């Protein structure tokens, strides 16, 4: 008997991917294998397995990628100070390349002819997933149900789920939940009342951060240690990448740090509004800039600032595995070996204050900058310097 073809589905266990699972089974003569990447989201392994088995799935993969995600994807992005459109720390964008890579690896392991994802036809994630699929498996077929099926609305999905006895999640009021994506780096919330930009985001939406008004009346202090450009310690204790970010998420979140309400320009050409929480990432961005300020020369820092918007845009658009991103990463990392030391931060009601910076790889000279008399800086050279730049104004 000839064995069935196989499809590997990026599966969360939620409504959308459960519907896609059933739809694939109905429309393709193939075995569907469920792949779940644990990148630090709230994950219920028993629920995922139960929901998949209910629909007849035999092979279910749940892969712990938390440390890999932080070390090989988040940390390089922190080194590049990647921020899209001034505020977005790219929490959703950076998870997709890793998931796509490992999903293709699963497809190759099981000899699957196709992969599938649950990204909608209006979103950026379909691009991010499929560019990753193409990079690692250019011959693997891609099935994007949202661009194929006739289930064109949330109402259609609910009807399909009821017809096939697929559990429909609801919020505390019994209504369909918001669209939520989370990983160890961030949580994003979209849809429903947020679709109208005149509506304020309800406080109950926030999952990782307290309101700054309700944050403790006493400040918290945290010291982050860096080696070769990456954070390695919190308050002197060495931690794995995943545990380090988790610890920073906790301390920043309880102090109301890391909230963003953003209307962004999607790659596909439409605007969308979302509420993002990136508590630990916000701390790391501040601390990394602070440690670079005393370890790197001006030209290197300015070059990084110059390329950052393009670097961030490449990540946002799904080009993590592109030659352009690889080249920019080399520039970002050119002097990362000098970025060593520690930064102490004060956290208070949504605000971050840099308290101190310490390093042995010092580009900062106390003698040169001192207001006291010293012989290390020749002030007479300054007049020639100014005259030279006066000439540039006339040319």
From Swiss-Prot:
GO terms for molecular function: argininosuccinate synthase activity; ATP binding. The keyword Membrane does not apply. Pfam families: Arginosuc_syn_C (PF20979), Arginosuc_synth (PF00764). GO terms for biological process: argininosuccinate metabolic process; L-arginine biosynthetic process; urea cycle. InterPro entries: Arginosuc_syn_C, Arginosuc_syn_N, Arginosuc_synth, Arginosuc_synth_CS, Arginosuc_synth_type_1_subfam, AS_cat/multimer_dom_body, Rossmann-like_a/b/a_fold. The keyword Ligase applies. L-citrulline binds at residues 88, 93, 124, 128, 179, 188, 264, 276. It is found in: Cytoplasm. Disulfide bonds: none annotated. L-aspartate binds at residues 120, 124-125. One of its GO terms (cellular component) is cytoplasm. Its EC number is 6.3.4.5. Pathway: Amino-acid biosynthesis; L-arginine biosynthesis; L-arginine from L-ornithine and carbamoyl phosphate: step 2/3. It catalyses: L-citrulline + L-aspartate + ATP = 2-(N(omega)-L-arginino)succinate + AMP + diphosphate + H(+). ATP binds at residues 10-18, 37, 118. It is an enzyme of class 6 (ligase). Keywords: Amino-acid biosynthesis, Arginine biosynthesis, ATP-binding, Cytoplasm, Ligase, Nucleotide-binding. Belongs to the argininosuccinate synthase family. Type 1 subfamily. Homotetramer. This is Argininosuccinate synthase. It comes from Pelagibacter ubique (strain HTCC1062).
């Amino acid at each position: 008997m000839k064995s069935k073809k196989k499809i590997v589905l990026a599966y969360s266990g939620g409504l959308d991917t459960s519907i896609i699972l059933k739809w694939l089974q109905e429309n393709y003569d193939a075995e569907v294998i469920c792949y779940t990447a644990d990148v630090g989201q709230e994950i219920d392994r028993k629920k995922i397995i139960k929901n998949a088995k209910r629909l007849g799935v035999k092979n279910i993969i749940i892969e712990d990628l938390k440390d890999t995600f932080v070390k090989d994807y988040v940390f390089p992005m922190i080194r590049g100070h990647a921020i899209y459109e001034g505020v977005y720390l790219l929490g959703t964008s950076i998870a997709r390349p890793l998931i796509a890579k490992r999903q293709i690896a699963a497809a190759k392991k099981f000899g699957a002819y196709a992969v599938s994802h649950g990204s909608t036809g209006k979103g950026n994630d379909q691009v991010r997933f499929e560019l990753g699929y193409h990079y690692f498996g250019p011959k693997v077929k891609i099935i994007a149900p949202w661009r194929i099926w006739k289930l064109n609305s949330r109402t259609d999905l609910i009807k399909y789920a009821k017809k096939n006895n697929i559990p429909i999640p609801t919020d505390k009021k019994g209504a369909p939940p918001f669209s939520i994506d989370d990983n160890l780096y961030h949580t994003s919330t979209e849809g429903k009342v947020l679709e109208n930009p005149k509506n304020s985001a309800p406080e109950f939406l926030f999952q990782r951060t307290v309101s700054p008004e309700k944050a403790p009346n006493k400040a918290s202090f945290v010291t982050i240690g860096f080696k070769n450009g990456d954070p390695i310690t919190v308050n002197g204790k060495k931690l794995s990448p995943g545990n380090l970010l988790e610890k920073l998420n906790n301390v920043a979140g309880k102090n109301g740090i890391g909230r963003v309400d953003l209307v962004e320009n999607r790659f596909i050409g439409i605007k969308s509004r979302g509420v993002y929480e990136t508590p630990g990432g916000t701390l790391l961005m501040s601390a990394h800039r602070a440690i670079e300020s005393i370890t790197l020369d001006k030209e290197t820092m300015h070059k990084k600032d110059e390329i950052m918007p393009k670097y961030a845009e490449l990540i946002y658009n799904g080009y993590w595995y592109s030659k352009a991103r690889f080249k920019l990463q080399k520039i970002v990392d050119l002097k990362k070996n000098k970025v060593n030391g520690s930064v102490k931060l004060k956290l208070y009601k949504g605000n971050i204050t840099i308290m101190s910076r310490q390093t042995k790889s010092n580009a900062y000279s106390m003698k040169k900058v001192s207001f006291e008399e010293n012989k290390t800086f020749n002030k007479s050279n300054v007049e020639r310097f100014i005259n030279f730049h006066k000439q540039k104004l006339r040319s």
